[in-house]
């Protein structure tokens, strides 16, 4: 009788240096986390000892164990029987065999994998079960440069911080901020920036979260200046979303700052001041938006002593912004409290999607 490729021998005692990860492995096996992938992602490859999904699973375990690539499978996973046994594997495929399975994947396989990942997210996430009637769903959208070898798929020259002339790719991400859950990850070539990636990322998030028109009306999309153009914001508004963004145009930012007569010191940052307020949708200097927006001018003292100016744009009511930052919605009539709430709400991007990128790169 052929031995199954999963299901460790309960009579064998083993030890591992990855005890906490082994516990996670037992739990993931209980959840049958890879079930949708096993059922929905057929890979045209002959099975000798391990099925294609078995080999994908080995690659997944190796990544959880800290591997930076499939080349580390032999050293990190294959040499640790207790660890792969905890994940339900009786043995581990050799790294070159796992790589062959990756090479056998096609564009159709990628689409099938995305559908399977959607099924996994919906089955186990809080973001998918969010109650839109009780509160706002917050989605952060951002990009991060991922340097790589020049032979890697989609590798092109692009912008990578502190690494000039380095080939790489851009990772686009949508994060369900309240739950610290990655809703969508998509890989783009090294030249792609958020202004180009915004549309496919948002549409993918709509698919994963099953966002109909009513849910989109209760969803706040938060983006930086890379997608803060009038056309980008209007596209989101046309889809029915609320938006919190930083204006892409320095000309509009300078124009608004020149109109501010009362700059208020930011109590959280002594080098920053805030000013601004509601702007009608038909204000040509603000940009022709599809609905009334609030624009808050923010200036920060730079190292050369001059002011750096930015503008935060938001479609939320002040009471909603105050509530989202833990303030009192009754302060919505206070211009200073409202302006500060919008700025603080934008600042929280740094504790959301930007933090997830840093954690990914630090391991």
Model-derived regions: residue spans:
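Generic, well-ordered alpha-helical scaffold segments in large soluble proteins
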Residues: 76-80, 104, 201-208, 235, ...
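Short, glycine/acidic-rich beta->alpha junctions
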Residues: 53-54, 65, 225-228, 338-341
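Flexible loop/turn segments at secondary-structure boundaries
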Residues: 83, 146-148, 181, 191-192, ...
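Short secondary-structure boundary/capping segments
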Residues: 153-158, 235-241, 258-263
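Anionic group-transfer/hydrolysis microenvironments
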Residues: 117, 142-144, 224-226, 248, ...
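An anionic, glycine-rich sequence signature occurring as long contiguous blocks
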Residues: 2, 242-359
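Domain-level cores of phosphate- or acyl-group-handling catalytic modules
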Residues: 194-254
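Dynamic "connector" segments at or just before major functional cores
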Residues: 1-167, 171-193, 198-207, 211-214
């Amino acid at each position: 009788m052929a031995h199954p490729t999963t299901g460790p021998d309960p009579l064998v005692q083993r030890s591992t240096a990855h005890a906490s990860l082994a516990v996670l492995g037992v739990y993931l096996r209980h959840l049958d986390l890879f079930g949708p992938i096993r059922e929905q992602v057929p890979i045209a490859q002959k099975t000798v000892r391990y099925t294609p999904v078995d080999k994908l699973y080995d690659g997944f375990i190796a990544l959880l164990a800290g591997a930076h690539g499939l080349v580390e499978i032999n050293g990190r996973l294959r040499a640790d029987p207790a660890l792969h046994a905890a994940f339900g594997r009786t043995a581990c495929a050799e790294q070159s065999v796992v790589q062959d399975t990756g090479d056998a994947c096609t564009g159709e396989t990628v689409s099938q994998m995305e559908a399977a990942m959607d099924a996994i997210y919906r089955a186990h996430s809080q973001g998918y079960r969010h109650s839109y009637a009780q509160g706002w769903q917050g989605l952060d959208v951002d990009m991060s440069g991922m340097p790589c070898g020049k032979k890697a798929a989609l590798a092109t020259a692009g912008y990578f911080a502190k690494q000039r002339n380095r080939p790489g790719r851009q990772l686009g991400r949508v994060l369900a901020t309240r739950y610290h859950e990655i809703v969508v990850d998509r890989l783009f070539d090294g030249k792609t920036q958020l202004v180009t990636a915004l549309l496919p990322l948002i549409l993918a998030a709509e698919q994963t979260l099953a966002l109909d028109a009513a849910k989109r009306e209760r969803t706040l999309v938060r983006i930086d200046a890379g997608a803060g153009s009038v056309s980008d914001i209007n596209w989101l508004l046309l889809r029915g979303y609320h938006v919190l963004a930083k204006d892409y145009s320095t000309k509009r930012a300078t124009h608004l700052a020149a109109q501010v007569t009362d700059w208020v010191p930011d109590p959280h940052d002594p080098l920053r001041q805030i000013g601004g307020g509601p702007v009608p949708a038909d204000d040509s200097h603000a940009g022709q938006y599809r609905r009334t927006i609030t624009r808050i001018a923010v200036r920060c003292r730079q190292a050369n002593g001059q002011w750096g100016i930015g503008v935060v744009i938001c479609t939320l009511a002040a009471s909603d912004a105050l509530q989202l930052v833990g303030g009192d919605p009754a302060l919505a009539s206070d211009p200073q409290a409202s302006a500060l709430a919008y700025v603080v709400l934008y600042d929280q991007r740094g504790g959301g999607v930007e933090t997830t990128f840093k954690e990914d790169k630090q391991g």
